[in-house]
Amino acid sequence: MRSGGQDIQVLIDAVETDDTVPGGPVVLYRLLIEDPAKRTFQNACLPDARGRQLGLPLQKETGVDFTCTSGAEGKCILMGYRPWDDRADVPMQDLHAACVHMMCADYGGDDRPATRDGTLVDIYDRFGIQKPDSVDPLPFEAAWGKNGALCVAHTRIAENVTLDGLAKAYPKLRSSLGPEVCTEEAMRHHPAALLFNRSASTAP
């Protein structure tokens, strides 16, 4: 495996199956990477919400890579959005991409995360893989497509980015910002809207 332009050795130390993933079990691996200076191996992944330090292989355009369950890609897979699952009724690759953008609050789809670890987010989709929380629902935040947000009612962390900031950075979103124009009801009819989320509204 290559990292930072260097070849590093990866050791699969353990294997376990997560049977709680929507759509069926997913095999996870405990991955160890070599520290050449110390000639020792250390865990490649940070702990996820369940304290597990696990990962799994993920096919990308550049080849096979490993992703951790603590990262956005891994979290989205464990929510049931499997990019390798070629289904006629659900665009899984696009749904996984939308989920990664949503998880990071990457509104413009250009790998500029605007979230904060530990932020409570309610995630659901138009296909019923994930369903919205019906108890004390949070305010609607945004609708998401494969290339980022399609509309934003409020930003997740106002300290990181505001609606005005999004309007300046992403002209394509200017007419789709604010709770008056960005509603779940309206976006349910948008063909490119795959994923939706709610989060607590924060003041700048």
Where in this protein do the model-derived segments appear?
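Long, compositionally biased low-complexity segments
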Residues: 3-204
